[in-house]
């Protein structure tokens, strides 16, 4: 369709589509810094349900080297709930789990916190295992982690901080798309 009609919050809209640009997941968040991506770089965008992996080699995305794993923050949350139920025979509110994910701690008893952090640490080890399955080698490349799940890496990962960049700005992708649209408009490619 070249035009779409819809209403949102009791306001009717008519939108004409004049062009579409498609970018790999995670690319927009780093598009304004491509000049920093010398050598081999792995991008890891950890979302709620998936983890998207791509390579940028010498400032250029490698189109044949992009992967999606069903290994996002929600799966970690489910693992935490399961372990808390198994060990403590109780449920834990999602807000508590998310607070531990984001900050590494919460105002709860130490044994519950240990169960949550141990589970998150194991889960993050699984993230790095999957990255290695896609040829991640910290001695040969840099890792750039973004998305809502980047806090898991920051708080529970074991990594060389000089070789890993964590961008926990959850608006990074939206800012990147805005940057790419402005770049297109400046080049005269607005349709």
Which role fits each region the language model picked out?
Residues 1-43, 61-75, 95-191:
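Nucleotide/phosphate-binding catalytic cleft detector across ATP-hydrolyzing
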Residues 57-59:
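A short beta-strand motif that forms part of the nucleic acid-binding face
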Residues 83-95:
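Active-site-adjacent segment of 2-oxoglutarate/Fe(II) JmjC oxygenases
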Residues 44-48:
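Active-site-proximal alpha-helical scaffolds that flank and shape metal-associated catalytic sites
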Residues 51-55:
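Short beta-strand scaffold segments in enzyme catalytic cores
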